[in-house]
């Protein structure tokens, strides 16, 4: 059996054709819908990014009584248990918080991982001069404005 779990921090399900949205044109999600199981009755303990990931790894609620942070030495990780039992897992993530102080140690639980650079406030590319900010973009993080110059359309 193969299983793929897709997680998004900022994507609302009411905007997806898989959940009944008929005015968004999303051919990749429509194609994905044909090959996946859709869960309609799922509840989360934490909505913020890192607390939600810790709950996913450990199976324990932690938000409101534990701060944003790494796995602790006493934490059991689902993905580490899979690895110890010869079940391969892979993390592909643009969630740069995994590599920040306080957020580390999550990706080491997987069999392998790749970090997709350049999202949000990830300081992927360097530039001394401040980037030009087009008026229609509003206020964005400096690293994002620098990074987007290096991303292909």
Q: What is each residue range found by the language model?
A:
Residues 1-37, 46:
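Active-site-proximal N-terminal segment of extracellular/periplasmic enzymes that hydrolyze or transfer
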Residues 11, 34, 38, 51-52, ...:
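Residue-level signal for pocket-adjacent positions within structured domains
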Residues 13, 38, 62-66:
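Short helix-loop boundary/capping segments at the starts of domains
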Residues 22-25, 44, 69-76:
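A short beta-strand-to-alpha-helix junction
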Residues 29, 41-42, 60:
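PAPS-dependent sulfotransferase catalytic core
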Residues 37-44, 88-94:
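Conserved S-adenosyl-L-methionine
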Residues 42-55:
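Short, surface-exposed acidic-centric catalytic microdomains
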Residues 55-153:
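Catalytic-site neighborhoods of secreted/periplasmic enzymes
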């Amino acid at each position: 059996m193969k299983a793929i779990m897709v997680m998004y921090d900022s994507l609302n399900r009411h905007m997806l054709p898989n959940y009944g949205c008929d005015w968004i044109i999303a051919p990749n999600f429509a194609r994905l819908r044909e090959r996946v199981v859709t869960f309609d009755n799922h509840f989360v303990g934490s909505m913020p990014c890192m607390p939600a990931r810790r709950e996913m790894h450990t199976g324990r609620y932690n938000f409101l009584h534990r701060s944003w942070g790494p796995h602790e030495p006493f934490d059991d990780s689902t993905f580490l248990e899979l690895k110890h039992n010869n079940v391969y897992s892979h993390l592909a993530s643009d969630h740069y918080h995994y590599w920040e102080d306080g957020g580390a140690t999550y990706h080491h639980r997987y069999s392998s991982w790749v970090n997709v650079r350049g999202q949000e406030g990830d300081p992927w590319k360097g530039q001394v001069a401040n980037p030009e900010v087009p008026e229609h973009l509003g206020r964005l993080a400096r690293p994002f404005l620098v990074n987007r110059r290096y991303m292909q359309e």
